[in-house]
């Protein structure tokens, strides 16, 4: 029985499989682009770099990956997009869908499992090969819910506090880098 893999681990396998397969089949576009959410594993950046793929890190939510596809499309370069993912098991393996697509993700996992089985390997063994090549990354997901308007107020307070007093350590580990991400896109909250 194979232990379950978290979303980032599965996406890393898919990313490596797609890149290696496109190179093997001669279908890798010039200057290929992959996108991932900022909460997804940084191991994806290393895999992308290995294959000469630009890795764009976007905010959480598939609309941001879709936005990158739209930008490529507007520039007449949509064929450069080869893969997008979030750690929540969401995949895009081409520019034809602009939102999380479980169907293509399921198909990719099945295809990948069959491919590696035919080679005498497995998804887990291939993930271990990737870790041996690039280093092992810890992937852990914590989720917090803040329902309703009071929840929104609480989130705003937490974020303000983090901006005004950035943490020196987090979970017992020293903070070595802090990135403040701010978007100026208006939200629909003012419409409520």
What is the predicted role of each segment?
Residues 1-7, 12, 181-192:
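Single conserved hydrophobic/aromatic residue that forms the stacking wall/gate
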Residues 2, 62, 88-89, 94, ...:
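Generic secondary-structure boundary/loop-capping signal
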Residues 2, 28-31, 165-166, 185:
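Intrinsic-disorder/low-complexity coil detector
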Residues 8-9, 13-133:
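Phosphate-binding chemistry for phosphorylated carbohydrates and sugar-nucleotides
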Residues 92, 107, 138-141, 191:
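A ubiquitous, low-specificity "background" feature that marks scattered single residues
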Residues 119-184, 188:
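Catalytic-core signal marking the mid-to-C-terminal active-site face
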């Amino acid at each position: 029985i194979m232990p379950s893999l978290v979303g980032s681990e599965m996406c890393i396998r898919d990313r490596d499989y797609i890149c290696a397969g496109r190179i093997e089949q001669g279908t890798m576009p010039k200057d290929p682009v992959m996108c991932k959410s900022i909460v997804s594993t940084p191991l994806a950046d290393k895999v992308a770099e290995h294959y000469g793929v630009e890795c764009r890190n976007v905010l959480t939510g598939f609309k941001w990956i879709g936005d990158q596809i739209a930008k490529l499309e507007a520039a007449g370069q949509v064929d450069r997009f080869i893969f997008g993912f979030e750690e929540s098991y969401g995949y895009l393996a081409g520019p034809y869908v602009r939102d999380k697509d479980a169907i293509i993700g399921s198909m990719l996992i099945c295809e990948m499992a069959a491919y590696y089985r035919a080679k005498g390997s497995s998804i887990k063994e291939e993930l271990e090969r990737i870790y041996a090549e690039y280093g092992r990354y810890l992937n852990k997901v914590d989720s917090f819910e803040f329902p309703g308007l009071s929840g929104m107020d609480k989130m705003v307070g937490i974020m303000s506090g983090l901006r005004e007093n950035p943490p020196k350590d987090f979970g017992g580990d020293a903070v070595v880098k802090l990135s403040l991400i701010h978007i100026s896109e208006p939200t629909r909250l003012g419409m409520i």
